[in-house]
Amino acid sequence: MSERQSPGFLDAVATAFLRRRLHSRRLRVAALRGLTTVSNGAGDGLQMDFDHAASCFAHATPWMAAHTKGLATAPVPPAEPPRVPPLSIVIMVIGSRGDIQPFIPIGRRLAERHRVRIATHREFRPMVERAGLEFYPLGGDPHEMMEYIVKTRGSIVPTRLGQLWEDVPKKRAMIAEILASTWRACTEPDPEGPEAQPFRADLIVANPPSYGHIHCAEALHTPLHMIFTMPWTATTAFPHPFARIDPGTYRPIENFFSYGIVDLLVWAGIGDLVDDFRTKTLNLSPITLADGASLLDDYEVPFTYLWPESLVPKPKEWGPHIDLANFIEYEQAHTYQPPQSLLDFLAAGEAPIYVGFGSVVAEDPAALTRTIFTALDKANARGIVSQGWAHLGNVAPPPNIYVIGDVPHDWLFARCRAVCHHGGAGTTSAGLRAGLPTVVVPFFGDQFFWGRVVADAGAGPEPIPIDRLTTEALTAAFDACRRQQVRERASELGGRLRAINGVELAVHSIERHLPAPAMYCSENPDHLAVLFCDRCGVRLCGRCSRLAHAGHVVHPYRYVDWGGGSPHGLVGELADLVGDAAQALHAGLAELVPSVTSSRDGVVFSDGESPSNADRGDPIRKLRRWLASW
């Protein structure tokens, strides 16, 4: 072990970190090396390696004790939402179909009192408009996004040569496109709509991967409310879904650290794009890496998570600005017309097991299909296999299997006896709400989190990661779904989930966190204030300004001040620790990408050193050498 990696060195780094005295860029990079590791094999990429830095976390134990001492032990009942004047609301969502669907019932409920626009990928326009909601196209191709995530196995920093050569530049271009489109979604008419109705957002609702949310809110001085289906707020209860560590494997302090590290590494890769967006499009000042990585936490932006308290309790660290709702089902059963062949298959025997991986892309669809078919046969089970984006079922199915395309989960799952899927939040919620035993085969990210939640709830067997999926493992999982204890637990859980109205809870959360009554017109509280009269010191809607305050000096009224914030708590300390290190990692990768673009077998390092022959064609080794050069 080198001097920089010795326990004594890590002790010194941890002590300096907690005292805000780690000023050396070289030491910060070394600290990042202590917290991460570059791995080969199916999990290529940058991963958390907390065992290597265990002594660092030992120094944080007193901080954690103080942090947890005063935490509330019981949830605080949420206040009633205030009376809210009609608003123009934009809901920005990036992701797959399952990511978009929960926002449609929320949007429809909000549209009873407000003007609502859902901004998402162009291919989801028909789904949004069928629900009677306005649409605006955001950038990015969800298919390409999913292919990238599957290739990298959800790695924060990809390191395979092909990824660095082709995928990283394409992903960065896609993020830049998404950022630019989020501002247009807040301020412009739908470019493809039948009527070019003006639009300016009074409230932004978004999921975290839409990137531009908080920056658009700052430029417009509007409230922001985040909604997501996976944990995105630091907690000691479980790790960040993209930290690539198994929930329950590490201590609370490591779980808490994982959120700050992931945020910093993500921002190291996109910070320059965000700053371009802020300065060139929004006319805002640039932000530092450490500040940008923690904006949502620093401003305590209201968050609603779409799962029930009974399944994943709200962590004690999460304050009153964070609410839990419930899974939200996008109901389609009442309009679905099934083909007769599907009805005949369902009527011909025992209820089948559903198998499908939704929007996940498979590297070898034929091999995966054969594994599924064989496991169903060995388990003496009938199956319905969904093709999805993985293109399953591309080989001739046996008589006990029916291959389907797009069928609504709420219709189909009511006719199945168990489900097997990738662990996406949408499919997980649909299966559990239907009261079905659930087998999760996670590929990346939050799918591992939901696989663990299902198993811990007793509603299914242990999850089977895709790189460990075998015919034997899948057969055993199908057999486990027949156990009476599993079936009873799944049925009980489904009944409890169906009894909670997640849409009402989510809308309640959005409205109660609005900065009312500061949004009201002082003279007509039923209208939104848009101007402020200096002479009278009152907030005004446009109508009152024209009638009663003609000739007065009025200014645009800003009911949210996104003034400067600063990192705080352990995440803030972590920003001080590895902010420069993450930026240095980004700079190193930025140098690595153009060099492999011009030469497949060589990398020009920052000091001009040429790689050894042993490094040629091996980006993992190149990245290790780059980190070691610090």
Predicted regions and their residues:
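Nucleotide-sugar-dependent glycosyltransferase catalytic domains
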Residues: S2-L71, R122-P352, F357-R382, G393-A396, ...
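Canonical RING-type zinc finger of E3 ubiquitin-protein ligases
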Residues: P525-C536
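Cys/His-rich, Zn2+-coordinating zinc-finger modules
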Residues: M519, D526, R539-G579, A584
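Nucleotide-activated donor-dependent transferases that construct or modify glycoconjugates
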Residues: P81-S96
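Nucleotide-activated donor-binding/catalytic signature segment of Leloir-type glycosyltransferases, i.e.
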Residues: N380, A390-P408
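A donor-sugar binding/catalytic signature common to diverse glycosyltransferases
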Residues: D99, I404-V453
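A short, glycine/small-residue-rich beta-strand->loop->alpha-helix junction that serves as a flexible
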Residues: V93-I104, V361-A362
